[in-house]
Amino acid sequence: MSDFMTEQEFRIEHDTMGEVKVPAQALWRAQTQRAVENFPISGRGLESAQIRAMGLLKAACAQVNKDSGALDAAKADAIIAAGKEIATGKHDAEFPIDVFQTGSGTSSNMNTNEVIASIAKANGTEVHPNDDVNMGQSSNDTFPTATHVAATEAAVNDLIPGLKVLHESLAKKANEWDSVVKSGRTHLMDAVPVTLGQEFGGYARQIQLGIERIEATLPRLGELAIGGTAVGTGINTSADFGGKVVAELVELTGVTQLQEAANHFEAQANRDALVEFSGAMRVVAVSLYKIANDIRLMGSGPLTGLGEIQLPDLQPGSSIMPGKVNPVLCETATQVSAQVIGNDAAVAFAGSQGQFELNVFIPVMARNVLESARLLANTARVFATRLVDGIVPNEEHMKQLAESSPSIVTPLNSAIGYEAAAKVAKAALAEGKTIRQTVIDMGFVDGEKLTEEELDKRLDVLAMANTDRKQKF
């Protein structure tokens, strides 16, 4: 009985290498099953964004083949419908192949072809995975095309909007806290005063520049290899196939940055645009780490840290210490930064692995790039709405710290000289007195070099921040 049930769980499919047992209910067929058995590596498949792009690409190709008369209209319509259905995410579970597979993505291309053929068959139309679904295509142009479609779509529709949310939150706080004075710090040591708004304005500018860096990659990221087929020559397809497919993809995705590759040999042999895009995301990750770490340090305490700002209480921080609350979103952001930087290292190496007419590290590049975009987009939104928007500054405490910093002696350089000012700073620190009192006690307020009124003016910590010098963020 057990053997009978086991047999019933499978069906027999075949390809050019022979028969293969496939799970009875699976939409995939022989070539996909071989890949599943060959690559039990990580348990991680393609990103959903890539599966979506593969579905849309097959639909676009079928439409062009239908319009040219190369593909029967009924078959084309069945492929188009199935491809669009895949793009909704409904069939993501039918893409079981590990990301660590053949480096061209051939296995995943055939996975897509087979699933589309099975969906079409279930809806009453027989189509062949190779002859019909893959008409005018090769894995060598479809898989990189889908990768670039997914990456461009992720950048335009998710990553850039997510970063704009974070930029807006930081910029709002920069304006709100423009006059909230605090001690500046360099080398983690006391420095001359700044305002909390100036610091957050710097953070906002970092994110804005990150957005601009990502946007700058789009003209190259959006170049698509489709039409080059096996090696870039376009064998087995028409000269206008690639351009027409790209036009369909623009229509299907709404992403106007998509365009046919200017040189199909470059577009298949190299993945430089993915390396560039990943590098731009790495810069954002570096910025995000710095911002999150600064905020974490400013919020440290509540009693034995800097305690300059209060972070939102999001969840209990300890299973043993009652009442403890931790900067969990800062820690999330810094971990995401580490992952994105690591992903970029793999992408950079993988990008170097193009021998002659084809890069053969595309699946891992696609997975890492799309994961990085997703992680940064999600983190940016959550970091903005659940952390930055809820920060409360401890204004009086920050002002006290700023006024007690030895570095506020700096504006006295032009009145009493650098060496004398240094003596004041050291004496104030050693004796536990304010800079103002120390200057007076050391006899520098003599009515000639320095009056008491001039001293107070020079020691105005907010004035030291030069908030009238507006900065762009």
Swiss-Prot record:
GO cellular component: cytoplasm
UniProt keyword Lyase, yes or no: yes
Catalytic activity: (S)-malate = fumarate + H2O
Residue positions binding substrate: 104-106, 128-131, 138-140, 186, 319, 324-326
GO BP annotations listed: fumarate metabolic process; tricarboxylic acid cycle
EC number: 4.2.1.2
Further remark: There are 2 substrate-binding sites: the catalytic A site, and the non-catalytic B site that may play a role in the transfer of substrate or product between the active site and the solvent. Alternatively, the B site may bind allosteric effectors.
Function: Involved in the TCA cycle. Catalyzes the stereospecific interconversion of fumarate to L-malate.
Family statement: Belongs to the class-II fumarase/aspartase family. Fumarase subfamily.
Protein name: Fumarate hydratase class II
